[in-house]
Amino acid sequence: MTIDSGFNHITVLLDEAVEALAVRPDGCYLDGTFGRGGHSRLILSKLGPDGRLIGFDKDPQAIATGQTLAAEDGRFVVVQRSFAELGSVVAERGLTGKVSGILLDLGVSSPQLDDAERGFSFLNDGPLDMRMDPSRGISAAEFVNTAPVEEIARVFKEYGEERFSGRMARAVVERRDVTPFERTADLAEVLKVANPAWEKGKNPATRAFQGLRIQVNNELGDLEAGLEAALECLEVGGRLVVISFHSLEDRIVKLFMRKLVKGEADNLPRNLPVRHVAFEPKIKVHGKAQTASDAELKANPRSRSAVMRVAEKLR
């Protein structure tokens, strides 16, 4: 996640993430979530003339920033693709199994949250969109105006972890039957009224909006696909660094890494004669999950939920 306030950019866990990549001057690296380029610029500063960096992003505004950087630095290219597709992009360039490090900085960025026209936030009224790439998929408005009440409730509960998901979904459907939703503030007000137990200091629409954003952008599906692709792309000794911003993301990352540390033994029938390598770990995890320092939390409160996990490919 890149924090952007006007022209000031604060990239979460900037130094820690790039340090965890252990950048080699001649290495090839992937920034799976380019954003406004905070991590990419620091990676480039550590690369030599023969180093390479490929940036990925779905957001056209991020791509525009990336194209400017690419014009300034020939070691960098940016592609408008989800990191879930990094395997095919890497294969097209003949780099499968040759990538030195991959960084995934998950979630929505502050430029997206703070731009009312993108429709991500209930704090700033705008079109109810929420798509990272506005040219692909259906908007949040289309979803809440057409999905069955059971599906809306599932999204609020599974992706937003909203305990009043059923009540809030019914309120959405009752209101859309009268007037379809078009604006973020309109939906936020309906959710606010339907939520009977507000948490102090938290907007009652927070969890439902998170669920909608995850649904619209297939965030968890992309994460699962991206993690699998990353493992194939990395060379032996290559690093995978993932920064997550809520428990659903972190759980997927943690379970993925735990599975690979254990090897394939759990996937094989007992007493089956197999080669010893099948029981060997595919990765090793570097250190414990890392969170933002007190200094970073003070400078950037939005970093409070960031969790970084680091793994190294062994085979």
UniProtKB/Swiss-Prot annotation:
Q: What positions does the entry give for S-adenosyl-L-methionine binding?
A: 37-39, 57, 83, 105, 112
Against InterPro entries, the record matches this protein to: RsmH, SAM-dep_MeTrfase_MraW_recog, SAM-dependent_MTases_sf
Which example biological process does GO assign this protein?
A: rRNA base methylation
Catalytic reaction equation(s): cytidine(1402) in 16S rRNA + S-adenosyl-L-methionine = N(4)-methylcytidine(1402) in 16S rRNA + S-adenosyl-L-homocysteine + H(+)
EC main group:
transferase
Entry-linked Pfam families: Methyltransf_5
- The EC designation for this entry is 2.1.1.199
UniProt KW keywords:
Cytoplasm, Methyltransferase, rRNA processing, S-adenosyl-L-methionine, Transferase
The protein's role, per its UniProt record: Specifically methylates the N4 position of cytidine in position 1402 (C1402) of 16S rRNA.
**Name the UniProt record assigns to this protein:** Ribosomal RNA small subunit methyltransferase H
Could you tell me the gene encoding this protein?
A: rsmH
